[in-house]
A protein has these predicted regions:
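Conserved class I S-adenosyl-L-methionine
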Residues: 14-28
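A short acidic, Gly/Pro-enriched loop at the edge of an enzyme's catalytic core
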Residues: 51-64
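A short, conserved alpha-helix within the catalytic core of class I
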Residues: 70-90, 98
């Protein structure tokens, strides 16, 4: 059973430089948004195989797009965020869009992403595990250990956090 359709307006989001996109199966949103900003964009998608190559590079920005809610436990989330921080340049930025998911809740939603040039990308996201949580407060608290929080937004069931590496 499909839940709500949520809307994210990304017309005013500008991510510049080399981007490390950790969006997993939601790939394409960050790429489509970024290629409107710059002619040539280097976006790397992380998989287990590419982790070793990452250690050789430093990125200007890192993005998570609705994938932290699939990670079990706060310590695991923190470990991933800490690792990603090591791939960012000094003062690199992290951008996180995710769903506010309390314990016991399941998610089956569609997200319409409004991109530059009036493009629209639809993404479905599901999380049927009632034990996993992913809340704005939980993620913000982890980020504050490694980043200066520059911007936050919470609307409907979604949150956005932008931080700059400290």
């Amino acid at each position: 059973m499909m839940g709500k359709t949520l809307i994210i307006n990304m017309n005013d989001v500008h991510i510049e430089g080399d981007i490390l996109d950790l969006s997993g199966e939601n790939t394409g949103v960050i790429y489509n948004m970024s290629k409107e900003v710059e002619e040539e964009v280097a976006i790397d998608y992380v998989s287990e195989e590419s982790k070793y190559e990452l250690k050789e590079r430093k990125y200007d920005a890192c993005t998570f797009f609705f994938n932290l809610n699939n990670i079990w436990g706060g310590r695991r989330k923190e470990s991933i965020i800490r690792e990603v921080s090591s791939y960012l340049k000094e003062e690199g930025s992290i951008y996180i869009w995710d769903v506010n998911k309390e314990r016991g809740k399941i998610i089956d939603n569609k997200v319409k992403v409004l991109l530059p040039n009036e493009k629209v990308k639809e993404v479905e996201f599901k999380n049927y595990n009632p034990l996993i949580t992913c809340t704005f407060e939980e993620v913000k608290k982890i980020l504050e250990k490694y980043y200066k929080i520059e911007e936050t937004k919470v609307w409907e069931d979604i949150f956005f956090i932008k931080g700059v590496r400290i």
